[in-house]
UniProtKB/Swiss-Prot annotation:
Annotated protein name in UniProt: Probable kinetochore protein NDC80
Membership in a protein family: Belongs to the NDC80/HEC1 family.
MF term (GO), any: microtubule binding
Gene Ontology annotations for the cellular component aspect, listed alphabetically: Ndc80 complex; nucleus
Region described as Disordered: spans on this chain: 1-132
Pfam families the record matches: Ndc80_HEC (PF03801)
Quaternary structure (record): Component of the NDC80 complex, which consists of at least NDC80, NUF2 and SPC25.
Amino acid sequence: MDFRRQTLVSNGGSSQPQPSVPSSAIKKASRLGPARQSLAPSQIQSRTSILGVSNSQENASHGMMGSRKSTVPGKMGDRDQLMSASRGDGGIYGRTPQMNRGIPGSVRRSSVFTSNSQGRTSMAPGVYSTAYKDPRPLRDKVFQSNCMRNVNEYLISVRYPLPLTAKTLTSPTAKEFQSIFKFLVNDLVDPGAAWGKKFEDDTLSILKDLKYPGMDSVSKTALTAPGAPQSWPNMLAMLNWLVDLCKALDNWDDPEIISDPLMVPATELPLDYPNLDDRLLWDFAAKTYSQWFDGEAEEFDEAEQELEHAYGKSYSIVLNDTEQATDRMASATVAECEKLEREIQKRNVEIQQLHVQEVCSPITDRISFADKSYKPPLKKLEDEYVQLMSDKNKFISFLDQQGQKIEKIRLRISKVKEAVISQEAELEARQSELAHIEQAVAAQNLSPDEVQRMNHERDSLTRSLEDLRNKISEASQFAYDQEMVVTKSMDRFEGLLTDYNSLAHQIGLLDFSLDVPSLAANVNYNLDVDLGAEELEEVKAVGVRMRSTIWQALQTCREMFRQEALGLGNGTIALEDEFDKLGQSVERQKEEVGNLEVRLKIVHNQAEDAQSQIASENSDTNKIITQLETEVTNMLAASQQGVLSTQSQLESTRIAFKELRHKTALFQDSVVAEVGEHIDAIIKAKEHTANSLKSIRALAETQ
């Protein structure tokens, strides 16, 4: 037994390091609120709705229908890249709100106090070393169209209570997206699920619980403005994934669709299913146990008949398969014999032909001697046949290639004809338009000077319009750049705020259940910043409070904690010295305890020997009683006349048994008394040892 001091933190257990902060500290639900609205003009052209909800086609403008309306297209990965690229921990805190996820040691802040020894290296695998790449083509129009169609058809089939318009699945508002998401989650997870005040936090938690593979593409900014052009493809793919889960859940119990062998009755499983006998036995035991537990029956004839029927059916199937296999083997053998007979006949014919050629062998020998390239007629015909078949196959492949070329040429010709027809129609339209314009000009009766002046004004207006377009483009680009800078700053601030909340929870500044230092108890360390506020004075006021009040209070707390840690370190050194002294005294007492344990073991062995002797005597007595009862039974069966003598002998035997049992009880009492005395002696020895240890400890404390 090792009495050396051990650390309170176990090195074993879970291989995943657990954070020392509460789950609410990792991502506090800060009231960032909706972000500011962009003043940049829209550069995105409206597109035609591809949903088949209405017969008419409407132009759905791509804009932000939520609180923050970003009018400039952006990349979906910018947010996550900025969060992970600006700092090492940005991707962790920004992507896992309110989750008790283990934070790697590489992103934790190192202590301001020096340590005497380095801690052991963590053996946990790097969870954040590799990023999952979504293989789905989220930006593909065809993929988006299929997702919209799938979501729309499912919502209609399950009677979605709210109306579906043409813009619902092309550029929805935040309210529409939240309604669809809540409807799918309530249908899939829990119909009575409770939703908190922060829809974004609940959504991220639910998707993480459902193990959504594209969690990196779902952020709070995207959930706040789901209808934005840079956010909607990812949100649409996520809704399509939820719809597929709902469909799979609806078909979970359909025997025509599922293929899970655990949900199929054992009698319908194939014979080659592994552990079929165990499955039949398990079903039989489960069915009969439920009947027995309910008290319905003690015998299970119906279940036994079903089990016998299942085994009989399996045996009949095996027998039928064996017979069919035998028949197939017999038929195959007969066919093989017939084939061999035909082959023999063919070889016999060839032998006859060779015999005929041997009759003409002198002539053949002279020809072959004169011409080395001479071949027998049969061999020559076979070579010619092989060559002709090869030419035939080549010609067929050539015809196929030419047919494919003809089809391609026909398609090209049809496309050219269509282009020619469209060009002719356009030319006719332009000619008619030119004639109409010439008639209008002729009707106006304009002079050449007026025409020249109008052309000059048109050129000047065109140049002015082009200049305005260039200025608008430059202003839009500048607004886009500024908006990207603001977005990056907001994301970086969100990550820094998360770090601040986590560290504040660790030292107890935000957890009011802990003891807050007296110097910092009157300071509110909670940061509630609304970056989406219209008035910038509120944000500036929070910044002033951060620099003036909170920063000074944190410096004071740091100095106080440093002094406290220094005092605790000195106290720890003193306690370690005292602990070493006590350890030496305990080692001496351990030797005495070991001697007492040896004595106790000897006493236990003696008690066990006595118990074994008593058990052997009891077994002998039981054997005698059994033998006597057997003799009594035989005597009763042999003759009725010996009943009286047998009863008298039985009475005498019972009296002897009672005396023997009485003696056994007395002996047991004596043994128990001796064991009790030994136990009392052991208890007294332990009490004496404990009192000695207490006196030694008191003496050590006084010294």
